[in-house]
């Protein structure tokens, strides 16, 4: 898995990124993160952060009722095996905002495609709740899904915000957009004061029994403790001095390590070095 995820970066994301740079355009998108796929193969890239390398924005997708008020636990859904509401509420947006903070290429830009396939009962009230949820977790670019040029009705992942005048809430969409744009514009130049790094446990998941990242993320979030999710790759490159480790421009004082049956030797060495300082 370690080599496979490196090869995915080298032969897919880097190739696309190089083309975009050569042609003067930004490169952005999202992986498939659903229900643990962010650290698995199949329909995932095997490692969220490696799958996002070289992109100018960190990206995620919130779709089909993944984030719903009160549904922050595992529950039945349209997807096989149900929906892991704990991951969607406490880890999904933090993956993107953490990558945006720690990868210098991204310059703090964290994007989310949102609102698709929630159905026609979603509405602007729910959309504002979802947008607020994402913004307080560090998302500062929103891609609304979707304005659909096809004739109404089209059954591809509604709601659609205009539908040639059939959506009665479209007249109010401007107020929602103005609000989100204003808040996100304020946030884009901010600095997130995280002192705690939460280890991304992909390598431990590949090797044996492990604790999913959303478990400690939930505890930290509900305790209102700011944190970023940090990876083995970032930790190996970190500057470690005076009891702190620095990744990009963020200085961390604490590293939270979820349970893992096995751990890569080089990761163990970095943690031991940090402990000794």
Predicted feature locations:
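Carbohydrate-binding surfaces of carbohydrate-active enzymes
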Residues: 1-58, 62-277
